[in-house]
């Protein structure tokens, strides 16, 4: 079995309101990474993560499930947490182990209570977050309404990709940072004219955010100079690490649309264990902070135990 260096690991919790597609997203991530060879469905009881008899019967997640996806030489450990408030402890456990979280919400045009709870828990636990707006091509979906509803309450949220829609279906996306558009196969296409205003608006917000992370970048921003790709990446990493930026992307987990691009963002932007926030621990009776250090003595954190009745 391949051993991954710390900077090639992402521990990611999938959290959010119940029924928004977290388990379907986990399934799609594993399928795209070829961890599994069949895209299972929650509705027919064939999903990998919902394996308990009660979960299959009720078509909901009841307990925290673990999976992984090896993508671009990076191991993404997936912690799929249930969304029902009755099982909130499972989500808290996932956030204790995760270095980042994907908050999954449907494109209903509004913000759900579960989305608010998930984002607030990430802030409380100091876990870097990314939002995945799911089911954008479902009937009567409203991606932009959903994005703006979340942005109105959480100023740190800015879309970094926008879905291209045709006939109510997602056919591609626009990268807000580069103003380049791509179809679902990754081929570059023209940015639709009716999306240009939104792209420019969000690009401006992102550039301003990046400028705020460094004095030299701020001066460059005020002088009207463009940032280099390296400066953009550095600024985004700093903003995410400082919990002042929550990227927002879109897709459809059930059909795997936008899932590879989501995994690209997890690899490129979200923290590996050494870059994540340190956790509090008791050492020799005193409270201290512990970070990840491959050269340090072994240290483990237990987040879940299971009693096997057999």
Where are the predicted features?
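Structural and coupling elements of P-loop NTPases
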Residues: 1-310
């Amino acid at each position: 079995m391949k051993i991954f260096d710390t900077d090639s690991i992402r521990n990611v919790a999938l959290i959010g309101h119940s029924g928004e597609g977290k388990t379907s997203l986990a399934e799609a991530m594993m399928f795209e990474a070829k961890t599994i060879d069949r895209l299972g469905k929650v509705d027919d009881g064939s999903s990998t993560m919902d394996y308990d008899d009660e979960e299959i019967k009720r078509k909901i997640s009841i307990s925290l499930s673990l999976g992984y996806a090896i993508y671009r030489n990076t191991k993404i450990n997936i912690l799929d947490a249930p969304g029902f408030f009755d099982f909130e402890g499972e989500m808290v456990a996932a956030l204790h182990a995760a270095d980042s979280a994907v908050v999954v919400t449907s494109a209903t045009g509004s913000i759900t209570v579960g989305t608010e709870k998930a984002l607030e828990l990430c802030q409380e636990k100091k876990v870097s977050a990314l939002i995945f707006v799911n089911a954008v091509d479902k009937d009567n979906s409203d991606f932009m309404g959903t994005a703006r509803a979340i942005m109105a309450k959480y100023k740190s949220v800015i879309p970094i990709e926008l879905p291209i829609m045709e006939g109510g279906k997602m056919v591609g996306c626009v990268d807000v940072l580069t103003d380049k558009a791509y179809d679902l196969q990754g081929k570059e296409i023209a940015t639709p004219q009716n999306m240009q205003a939104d792209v420019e608006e969000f690009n401006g917000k992102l550039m301003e955010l990046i400028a705020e992370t460094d004095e030299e970048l701020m001066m460059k921003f005020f002088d009207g100079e463009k940032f280099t790709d390296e400066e953009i990446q550095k600024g985004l990493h700093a903003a995410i690490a400082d919990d002042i930026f929550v990227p927002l992307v879109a897709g459809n987990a059930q059909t795997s649309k936008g899932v590879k691009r989501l995994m690209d963002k997890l690899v490129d932007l979200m923290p590996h264990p050494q870059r994540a926030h340190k956790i509090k621990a008791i050492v020799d009776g005193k409270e201290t902070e512990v970070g990840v250090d491959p050269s340090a003595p072994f240290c483990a954190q237990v987040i879940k135990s299971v009693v096997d009745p057999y």
